[in-house]
Structures are given as structure tokens and as C-alpha cells.
Design a protein with these regions (language model features):
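Asp-box/BNR beta-propeller blade signature and adjacent active/binding-site loops
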Residues: 1-139
Length: 139
């Protein structure tokens, strides 16, 4: 992955779509929009992209249609997203995600959800992601 390459993933509310664009010059110019809804099998609201290492990205957000908190793993720097993981669901409110790397090297993903409470009274929830880079696991 080139140092100036940027991947941007957005939801288009009007078109009921999720798309990505690429920049190869640090954000000065951008590629044409590419629809990734078929790859994700959902409209991903509030997509949150986290680079875990040079080639691996975690994409998380809300699957609008299924009312789920989901994440996907890309092992090719955002070209393909698969390995869908359903973290939680919600009744009427929830699912916006955020991810941070901990000092242990693990990643903490947090979201809110009313799956186990009254509707519209969400709890804050979290999970740890244990990710081992390929360079760490091969030696």
C-alpha cells in the first residue's frame, strides 16, 4: 500500500447505497464511486474503517436492514471485504461503532445497542478483537 493512498467508504442516503473511493495522492483527487453494497450484502450505515496493519482493514458499522452491528475483514488493503461478523442487534436504536488499538496490541470495538434494554434506551457495549499480523504468526 502506497503511503499516499487513502480509502474512503461512505453511505449514500439518497441512493440507499454504500460506496468507496480511492485517492492515490493523499486526498487531492479521488476515483469514481464504486458500489460495494453487493460485497457487504447490506447498506452499511456510519462505516468505520480501521487499518490493523499494512494489508488488513476492519470495516464496522450498522447493517440498516437487519438492525445489526457488523464488521468485515479485508486482507488486501480494502479491495475485498468478507468474513462478516455480527456483533449485536438492536430494536430501535444502536450500532454506531468505533475502534481503537490497545497497548496490548488488541483492538477494542465499542457500540451502543438497545438489544437487551427498553427500546431507545441503549447500553454501551464492547468487544476485544485479537488480531495477529501475518508477520507475527509465521515466525
Amino acid at each position: 500500500v502506497a503511503p499516499d493512498q487513502i480509502l474512503c467508504i461512505q453511505r449514500d442516503r439518497a441512493r440507499h447505497d454504500t460506496f468507496r473511493t480511492w485517492s492515490a495522492d493523499g486526498g487531492r483527487t479521488w476515483s469514481e464511486r464504486e458500489n460495494i453494497r453487493p460485497m457487504l450484502d447490506c447498506i452499511l450505515q456510519r462505516p468505520f474503517l480501521t487499518r490493523l496493519d499494512e494489508d488488513v482493514c476492519l470495516l464496522s458499522g450498522r447493517d440498516f436492514g437487519r438492525k445489526q452491528v457488523v464488521c468485515y475483514l479485508s486482507k488486501d488493503a480494502g479491495q475485498n471485504f468478507g468474513n462478516r461478523l455480527e456483533l449485536d442487534s438492536h430494536q430501535r436504536d444502536g450500532s454506531y461503532t468505533s475502534v481503537v488499538e490497545l497497548t496490548t496490541g488488541e483492538f477494542l470495538i465499542v457500540w451502543y445497542s438497545d438489544s437487551h434494554t427498553e427500546p431507545l434506551r441503549p447500553d454501551i457495549k464492547s468487544a476485544k478483537l485479537h488480531y495477529k499480523a501475518a508477520s507475527e504468526s509465521s515466525g
